Curated annotation (Swiss-Prot):
Protein localization: Lipid droplet; Membrane
Transmembrane regions listed in the UniProt entry: 14-34, 48-68, 69-89
Family recorded in the similarity comment: Belongs to the oleosin family.
Annotated GO biological process: lipid storage
Species lineage: Eukaryota, Viridiplantae, Streptophyta, Embryophyta, Tracheophyta
Native organism: Pinus massoniana (Chinese red pine)
Superkingdom as given in the UniProt entry: Eukaryota
InterPro entries: Oleosin
Tissue: Expressed in megagametophytes (at protein level).
Keywords: Lipid droplet, Membrane, Transmembrane, Transmembrane helix
Name of the protein in question: Oleosin G
GO cellular component terms attached to this protein's record: membrane; monolayer-surrounded lipid storage body
Mode of membrane association: Multi-pass membrane protein
Length: 138
């Protein structure tokens, strides 16, 4: 008898099961109601959609393109505004994010330009000496 009594659920478990059962039944009912409404809506609206599709499809296409255009124009405007703000802060010396990378790249480009200039000066002198060797009177 004690084993049977140990396996019986307590009132909290019973209340939890009843709550689970009731909420599951309500959700199942709402799912069926939604499915029924969807089917009835499709049955009623399909002939209307087919009849007006020569008007609705181009209209939907135009609306989609217009909305996409406005959203992308706004996004590009926001990107340009943030780039101008960053550039303003950089010029004013306020050190915006990424300024270190820009300074490093500028130094690398300047160093490379200096090396190219020095190499061109050396190579130009080398060519000048070769020309004088080839044509001593020139």
């Amino acid at each position: 008898m004690q084993k049977i009594h140990d396996h019986t659920p307590n009132p909290t478990q019973i209340l939890g099961f009843i709550t689970l059962f009731v909420s599951g039944a309500v959700l199942l009912f709402l799912t069926g109601l939604t499915l029924t409404g969807t089917v009835v809506g499709l049955v009623v609206l399909t002939p209307v959609l087919i009849f007006f599709s020569p008007i609705l499809i181009p209209l939907a296409t135009v609306l989609f393109v217009a909305v996409a255009g406005f959203l992308s124009a706004g996004g590009f405007g926001l990107a340009a505004l943030s780039a101008i703000s960053w550039l303003y802060n950089y010029i004013k010396g306020r050190h915006p994010p990424g300024a270190d990378q820009i300074d490093y790249a500028r130094m690398r480009i300047a160093d490379t330009a200096t090396h190219v200039k020095d190499y061109a000066r050396e190579y130009g002198g080398y060519l000048q000496s070769k020309i004088q060797d080839a044509a001593p009177g020139a």
